[in-house]
Amino acid sequence: MSEVLDNGQSRILVADDDPAILRLVKAIVEKEGYTVITARDGKEAYKVLQSGEPFAAAIFDVVMPYIQGTELVRYMQSEKRLMRIPVIMMTAEQNSRLSSDSFAAGAVAFLPKPFTNAQLQTMLRMFIRQS
C-alpha cells in the first residue's frame, strides 16, 4: 500500500500509554503493510518526532503521560518538516471537547475507543492517500 505515497514513506508513528491498545493498533497498521514505530507516552513520541525520521502518518492517544497527544500535534504543526503528516487521534474518554481540541490542534481524524479494525484501516487509507 505504501506505493500510493508520493514520497515512498511507509512508516507510521503510534503513541499510546496502554500496552494492549499499542499492540492492537500496531497489528492493524502492520496488516496494512506499514512499518510501525511505537512510543509508550508523549515524551517518547516527541523524541521520535525530533529524530528527523520520515513518517507517512501518526496515531496518538489524546491522554498520555508527560505530553498529551494534542500537544504533540501542535508541535508537529509548528515544524515545517512535520506539519504535512496526517495525525489520527484516539481516546477512550467520553468528552466531546477532546475531539474539538484535537481538530483545532491540527489532527485530521478522531477515533473513539473502542474502535474496529475496519474503522482504523479506513482512516489510514483515506488520510494517507490525501497527504
What positions do the PLM features span?
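The feature encodes the CheY-like receiver
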Residues: 22, 65-66, 83, 95
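Charged docking surfaces used in two-component/phosphorelay signaling
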Residues: 23-31
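A Lys-centered signature of the CheY-like receiver
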Residues: 113
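Non-catalytic signal-transmission and effector/linker regions of two-component phosphorelay proteins
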Residues: 1-13, 118-131
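Acidic, metal-coordinating helix/loop segments flanking the phosphotransfer/catalytic sites
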Residues: 38-57
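Short, glycine/charged-rich "phosphate-handling" switch motifs in NTP-dependent
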Residues: 108
